[in-house]
């Protein structure tokens, strides 16, 4: 029973890490990356549709994204969605494909993005601590219901704390890696 608490917590930690990696992927680092467009939805025939379901996205050069719509009639809708997004990138429409040239980041922009990385990372740490709290509460509940002894509870709490520390350390290394990526020119 005690192992299931730790296993559940570790599974939730892994989901938090995956979510953080996705969020970091959406923060542009001056290089073209198709994941920059993951959060863009296009109003297509009246329904919000993810961009990656309407077009293939390729990276022909280091700072260029090429969007090739499956339906050429959707090109204006895709262009509008990109313009309305918070990417700050102007699409170039040549009638059949859309090119996005990722501008080089200024020093000021790099520092702003690094702050954003820290903020997103801190939110992930809060999620980890909430998972730890839930696991600790579950362990105390089991001890209260006499499913585990007090000694088993103490051991379980130590194991939960160690798993939490490992998860937080992984987040710290992910933050440091993304900041390094952003701040290197």
From Swiss-Prot:
The keyword DNA damage does not apply. GO terms for biological process: translational termination. Transmembrane segments: none annotated. It is found in: Cytoplasm. Keywords: Cytoplasm, Protein biosynthesis. Belongs to the RRF family. Responsible for the release of ribosomes from messenger RNA at the termination of protein biosynthesis. May increase the efficiency of translation by recycling ribosomes from one round of translation to another. This is Ribosome-recycling factor. It comes from Streptococcus thermophilus (strain ATCC BAA-250 / LMG 18311). The lineage of its organism: Bacteria, Bacillati, Bacillota, Bacilli, Lactobacillales.
